[in-house]
């Protein structure tokens, strides 16, 4: 994989910048932490070289100074709001986050329930945490929020919230998802800190959009693609331009709320430490791009992936996705279209050469493309996977890594005993068959050694793959796109 981002430089520069921001205030900084902390795969795709856990590793460099406060809205607890990526509710995700933070040595100080309401589900959640030794605090709905600044910044506003007791200079405010109230918690804490004579500060940590890249840079367009369902819009920061005469990039929600936040700062502290939304941020990612062309290409590919996913989701649901039109606009702005990538062209060519049967193509790190076709033993994705491993291992494409004799009993098991209509082996099944062939087949052993080199490779399928195949390819770290059509497109029900 071509590298466009210096991860080591990022870890050092980002942690140093946060330390500088802590020092600007009374050795107390509330850091609103947006985005994914443990598994930022979007960042790793658009900034090749950025590790999915880079933000976590950066925090670990500050772990002696840092404590974590997790924020969850009472409304989300009562509504059983789900995290789509993990398939768990927000309240369960709080427990997962606590385990994850503590597991790497970060101190979790407490959990704050925002928009508190006296509901049985909320009480049970608090009691469970307290029983586990985790302190809980309550923040309440404030009438007139966020525009009635005078009321909010008063004893009848923030003053009614619990003061979250913290021990360390850096307080990281994070949450299971958006809309949990992270910024409100930070500002409420500032109010209480100033009441106690502590001149604490606030900063915002978000990787995207990258403030010191151009507005229409593919990395920033890819962020808009990733948040198309939220309708976030990147825009130039007018406050930063007015204050410093410099053009920077932020997104609409931060720009729109800045006058309100600024007024709150002035009421809390007497004056605001910031002159623009960009000033509030601490993101150093833009300074760690070492190959702009690599990041541009990766980001353009990501926009295409997002569009294909939207089309496939639309096909599966039968409902037009509003974000589709936003994604089409972004593709137009980026100057890209479907069918332009070589991996797509080769997959379609293989399908045409096999009378329209499903086909797949994989682009390896060096740009080489291998294809796979539908056969009696393997699906197209499974075939492409084996062919990619052969290519990586320097094995002739005609060599069998797994014999038909080994595959046929698995097919019998699937169709005769497990109720499957499709006898062909899925990607997970062929990998298991490959691993079981290692002791008897030296080529299978060589191919197995190449599996890590599939990470970061694009794979394109001419039909929507099953969730089994999609999950396996995701576990391998491959980037899947599918045409929005099913193998048996005339059927009304399609197994996921």
Report each predicted region and the residues it spans.
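Flexible phosphate-sensing "switch/lid" loops adjacent to ATP/NTP-binding sites
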Residues: 1-174, 189-350, 354-357, 364-366, ...
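The conserved Walker
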Residues: 177-178
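Transmembrane alpha-helical segments and their cytosolic interface motifs
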Residues: 182, 359-361
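Hydrophobic positions on the alpha1 helix immediately C-terminal to the Walker A/P-loop
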Residues: 185
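Short clusters of small/polar residues that mark proteolytic maturation junctions
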Residues: 373-374
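A short, polar/charged loop-to-alpha-helix boundary motif
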Residues: 377-393
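Short HxH-centered metal-ligating active-site micro-motif
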Residues: 391-423
């Amino acid at each position: 994989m071509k590298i466009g981002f210096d991860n080591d430089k990022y870890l050092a520069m980002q942690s140093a910048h946060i330390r500088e921001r802590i020092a600007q205030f009374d050795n107390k900084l509330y850091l609103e932490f947006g985005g994914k902390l443990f598994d930022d795969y979007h960042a790793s795709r658009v900034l090749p070289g950025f590790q999915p856990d880079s933000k976590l590793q950066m925090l670990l460099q500050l772990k002696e100074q840092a404590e974590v406060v997790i924020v969850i809205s009472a409304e989300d607890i009562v509504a059983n709001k789900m995290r789509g990526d993990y398939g768990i509710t927000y309240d369960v995700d709080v427990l997962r986050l606590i385990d994850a933070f503590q597991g790497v040595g970060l101190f979790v100080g407490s959990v704050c329930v925002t928009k508190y309401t006296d509901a049985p589900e909320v009480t049970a959640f608090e009691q469970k945490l307290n029983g586990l030794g985790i302190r809980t605090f309550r923040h309440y709905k404030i009438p007139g929020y966020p525009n009635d600044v005078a009321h909010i910044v008063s004893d009848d506003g923030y003053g009614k919230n619990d003061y979250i007791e913290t021990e360390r200079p850096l307080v990281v405010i994070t949450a299971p998802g958006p809309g949990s109230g992270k910024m409100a918690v930070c500002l409420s804490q500032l109010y209480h800190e100033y009441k106690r004579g502590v001149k604490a500060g606030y900063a915002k940590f978000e990787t995207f959009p990258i403030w010191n890249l151009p507005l229409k840079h593919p990395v920033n367009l890819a962020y808009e693609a990733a948040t198309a369902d939220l309708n976030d819009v990147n825009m130039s920061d007018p406050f930063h331009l007015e204050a410093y005469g410099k053009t920077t990039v932020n997104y609409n929600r931060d720009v729109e709320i800045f006058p309100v936040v600024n007024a709150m700062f002035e009421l809390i502290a007497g004056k605001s430490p910031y002159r623009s939304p960009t000033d509030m941020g601490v993101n150093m990612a833009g300074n760690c791009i070492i190959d702009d062309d690599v990041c541009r290409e990766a980001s353009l590919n990501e926009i295409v992936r997002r569009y294909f996913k939207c089309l496939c989701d639309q096909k599966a649901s039968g409902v037009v996705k509003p974000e589709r039109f936003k994604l089409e606009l972004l593709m137009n702005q980026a100057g890209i279209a479907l069918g332009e990538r070589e991996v797509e062209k080769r997959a379609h060519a293989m399908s045409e050469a096999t009378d329209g049967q499903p086909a797949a193509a994989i682009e390896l790190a060096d740009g080489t493309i291998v294809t796979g076709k539908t056969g009696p033993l393997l699906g197209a994705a499974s075939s492409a996977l084996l062919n990619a491993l052969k290519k990586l291992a320097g094995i002739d494409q005609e060599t069998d890594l797994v014999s038909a004799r080994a595959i046929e009993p698995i097919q019998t098991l699937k169709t005769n005993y497990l109720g499957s209509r499709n006898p062909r082996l899925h990607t997970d099944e062929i990998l298991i068959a490959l691993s079981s062939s290692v002791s008897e087949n030296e080529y299978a052993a060589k191919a197995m050694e190449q599996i890590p080199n599939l990470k970061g490779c694009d794979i394109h399928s001419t039909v929507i793959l099953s969730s089994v195949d999609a999950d396996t390819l995701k576990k391998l770290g491959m980037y899947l796109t599918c045409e929005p059509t099913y193998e048996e497109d005339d059927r009304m029900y399609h197994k996921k």
